[in-house]
Amino acid sequence: MSGGSSCSQTPSRAIPATRRVVLGDGVQLPPGDYSTTPGGTLFSTTPGGTRIIYDRKFLMECRNSPVTKTPPRDLPTIPGVTSPSSDEPPMEASQSHLRNSPEDKRAGGEESQFEMDI
C-alpha cells in the first residue's frame, strides 16, 4: 500500500494592521454585541474567538447604504414589527377585551391562582 501524502502549501499573507478609531462623545455606539477598546476601536468576537475589527468610516458608510433601507426578501408581515401598526385597534378586539374582564372569569368558576385569607 503506497499511501503517498500530498501536502499543499498555501501562500502566506501579511496580517492586516489594525487601526484605532476615536469616537466623539456625541456619537451613538452600536448595540451591545460590539465591544470597544479604551482607544475607541469597535470590535466583535466570533464563536471561534476571531476578532473582527470595524472602522468608524466603514460603519458610517454601511449605515447610509441603500441596502440598509431595503427589507429582506420573503419577510413575513407582522404588524408593528415588520410593517407599521395601524393607529386604531380593530373594534372586535377591543370589545372582546372588555368582555373578558377578570370579574367575568371568576364568575365562570375560575379562581385566582393564589388565594389568601388575612
Curated annotation (Swiss-Prot):
Cross-link (Glycyl lysine isopeptide (Lys-Gly) (interchain with G-Cter in ubiquitin)) at residue(s): 57
A GO term, aspect molecular function: translation initiation factor binding
Keywords: Acetylation, Cytoplasm, Isopeptide bond, Nucleus, Phosphoprotein, Protein synthesis inhibitor, Translation regulation, Ubl conjugation
Impact when changing residue 57 to R: Impaired ubiquitination by the BCR(KLHL25) complex
Gene Ontology annotations of biological process type: G1/S transition of mitotic cell cycle; negative regulation of translation; negative regulation of translational initiation; positive regulation of mitotic cell cycle; TOR signaling
GO CC terms: cytoplasm; cytosol; nucleus
Effect upon mutating residue 69 to R: Does not affect ubiquitination by the BCR(KLHL25) complex
Modification sites for Phosphothreonine: 37, 41, 46, 50, 70, 77
Motif TOS motif: chain residues: 114-118
InterPro entries: EIF4EBP
Maturation and modification: Phosphorylated on serine and threonine residues in response to insulin, EGF and PDGF. Phosphorylation at Thr-37, Thr-46, Ser-65 and Thr-70, corresponding to the hyperphosphorylated form, is regulated by mTORC1 and abolishes binding to EIF4E.
Subcellular location: Cytoplasm; Nucleus
Residue(s) carrying Phosphoserine: 44, 65, 83, 96, 101, 112
Pfam families: eIF_4EBP (PF05456)
Effect the entry attributes to changing residue 105 to R: Does not affect ubiquitination by the BCR(KLHL25) complex
Modified residues (N-acetylserine): 2
Domain remarks: The TOS motif mediates interaction with RPTOR, leading to promote phosphorylation by mTORC1 complex.
Family designation: Belongs to the eIF4E-binding protein family.
Assembly mode: Hypophosphorylated EIF4EBP1 competes with EIF4G1/EIF4G3 to interact with EIF4E; insulin stimulated MAP-kinase (MAPK1 and MAPK3) or mTORC1 phosphorylation of EIF4EBP1 causes dissociation of the complex allowing EIF4G1/EIF4G3 to bind and consequent initiation of translation. Interacts (via TOS motif) with RPTOR; promoting phosphorylation by mTORC1.
Protein task: Repressor of translation initiation that regulates EIF4E activity by preventing its assembly into the eIF4F complex: hypophosphorylated form competes with EIF4G1/EIF4G3 and strongly binds to EIF4E, leading to repress translation. In contrast, hyperphosphorylated form dissociates from EIF4E, allowing interaction between EIF4G1/EIF4G3 and EIF4E, leading to initiation of translation. Mediates the regulation of protein translation by hormones, growth factors and other stimuli that signal through the MAP kinase and mTORC1 pathways.
Protein name: Eukaryotic translation initiation factor 4E-binding protein 1
